[in-house]
UniProtKB/Swiss-Prot annotation:
One of its GO terms (biological process) is negative regulation of DNA-templated transcription. InterPro entries: GntR_C, TF_FadR/GntR_C, Tscrpt_reg_HTH_GntR, Tscrpt_reg_NanR, WH-like_DNA-bd_sf, WH_DNA-bd_sf. It comes from the Bacteria. The keyword Magnesium does not apply. The gene is nanR. PANTHER family: HTH-TYPE TRANSCRIPTIONAL REPRESSOR NANR, TRANSCRIPTIONAL REGULATOR, GNTR FAMILY. Keywords: DNA-binding, Repressor, Transcription, Transcription regulation. Residues 1-20 are annotated as: Disordered. One of its GO terms (molecular function) is DNA binding. This is HTH-type transcriptional repressor NanR. Belongs to the NanR family.
Length: 260
């Protein structure tokens, strides 16, 4: 586009109006320091466990003030790339599965707030946990089955207390996610349930009692199928359970909207 062309000027004015004449934001010094240090870490210029240069050395190297260096290190800590202890230099670390998933949290919550977002995440959960119960039916050890049985018993004891039942429900599914021994599965599962629970509507306790009893009976069916080492039956029981849960929350949500 020729900036001196009259048509270009008209187009530029139109674009300016649509964007509200918002200027492009300049990067902060701390962001530039963060990006450069991140690239150095990813290029293995600093090994895992190795301390980074001191704050004073980083200030001199990047020609920035202490606040910019500290903000950059704090951002790297949030990404799991460094560990920071009081009085010590930051050390390079490897991001955990939890750190990786937490980076997606903001985007996930935004997606959940859009129409159909919860349904898409419920479908993701169904596909994910379907694989978990099939694996459990085929591979779970006696010790893992014992933990699953214990989680089921706590589930039963919590039927009269909705807050406690929700915690025991989450714990039951968490034990399922632990069985493959994959930390990424665990991180995904914890985050997925956190996102879904936060997005669900608040419902009066009285309306959840029947739902809790149904969920508990469905948990029993899942555990029975796993004990029988029948992955197909375990999968069917899991799908019955999660489809029922989703239908219940949809109905309760619609009921709440109709009262407004």
């Amino acid at each position: 586009m020729n900036p001196f062309d009259s048509q270009s000027e008209d187009a530029s004015d139109a674009i300016g109006r649509s964007l509200g004449r918002r200027p492009l934001a300049r990067k902060k010094l701390s962001e530039m320091v963060e990006e450069e240090l991140e690239q150095m870490i990813r290029r293995r210029e600093f090994a895992e466990g190795e301390p980074l240069p001191s704050e004073r050395e980083l200030m001199a190297f990047f020609n920035v003030g202490r606040p910019s260096v500290r903000e950059a290190l704090a951002a790297l800590k949030r990404k799991g790339l460094v560990q920071i202890s009081n009085g010590e230099r930051a050390r390079v670390s490897r991001p955990s599965a939890d750190t990786i998933i937490s980076e997606l949290s903001g985007m996930a919550k935004d997606f959940l707030s859009h129409p159909g977002g919860i349904a898409h995440f419920e479908q993701l959960r169904l596909f994910f946990e379907s694989s978990l119960v099939r694996y459990a039916a085929e591979k779970a050890t006696d010790e893992q089955l014992e933990r699953l049985t214990k989680a089921l018993d706590i589930n039963r004891q919590s039927l009269a207390d909705n807050a406690q039942f929700i915690r025991s429900d989450v714990e039951f599914h968490r034990v399922l996610a632990e069985i493959p021994g994959n930390p990424i599965f665990m991180a995904i599962h914890v985050a997925l349930l956190d996102w879904l629970i936060a997005a669900r509507p608040a419902v009066p306790d009285a309306e959840l009692i029947e739902h809790n009893n149904i969920s508990y009976q469905q948990h029993i069916a899942i555990v029975d199928a796993i004990r029988k080492r029948d992955p197909d039956e375990a999968d069917r029981a899991l799908q019955t359970h999660l489809n029922s849960v989703f239908a219940t929350w949809q109905a309760l949500s619609q009921k709440k909207k109709s009262r407004k």
